[in-house]
Amino acid sequence: LDVLLGGDDGSLAFIPGNFSVSAGEKITFKNNAGFPHNVVFDEDEIPAGVDASKISMAEEDLLNAAGETYSVTLSEKGTYTFYCAPHQGAGMVGKVTVN
């Protein structure tokens, strides 16, 4: 599943922002607009026992150019909340449910 970082209109958002995947399905986050973005999973908003640091980009790592990607595969079922560290305050937050 591909998730865009930033809307075509320049909005600071994940597109789609709320989605479901099967356990083990690869999710690819792709910078759509050329603003610096990243993908960090909220350690308090993921299934118990999952290590947020193993599925997240480091807060200081950024996808700077349009077309740059970060991929992750989630195997534990449940709901995961993630955000873009530079734009979390602007509401750039998303949620994925793993079935």
Swiss-Prot record:
The Swiss-Prot or TrEMBL record lists the needed cofactor(s) as: Cu(2+)
Q: Where does Cu cation bind?
A: H37, C84, H87, M92
Q: Which NCBIfam families match?
A: cyanin_plasto
- Pfam hit, one: Copper-bind
What keywords were assigned to this record?
A: Chloroplast, Copper, Electron transport, Membrane, Metal-binding, Plastid, Thylakoid, Transport
Major subcellular location class: plastid
Q: What does this protein do?
A: Participates in electron transfer between P700 and the cytochrome b6-f complex in photosystem I.
- State the species of origin: Solanum tuberosum (Potato)
Q: What stretch or stretches form a coiled coil here? A: none
Annotated membrane topology is: Peripheral membrane protein
Of which family is this protein a member? Belongs to the plastocyanin family.
Report which superkingdom the organism of origin falls in: Eukaryota
Protein name, as recorded: Plastocyanin
Its annotated compartments are: Plastid, Chloroplast thylakoid membrane
Q: Which Gene3D superfamilies match?
A: Cupredoxins - blue copper proteins
Q: Name one GO cellular component term.
A: chloroplast thylakoid membrane
Please name the GO terms that the record assigns under molecular function.
Answer: copper ion binding; electron transfer activity
What InterPro entries does the entry give? Answer: BlueCu_1, BlueCu_1_BS, Copper_blue_Plastocyanin, Cupredoxin, Plastocyanin
Domain Plastocyanin-like positions: 1-99
The keyword Plastid is assigned to this record: yes
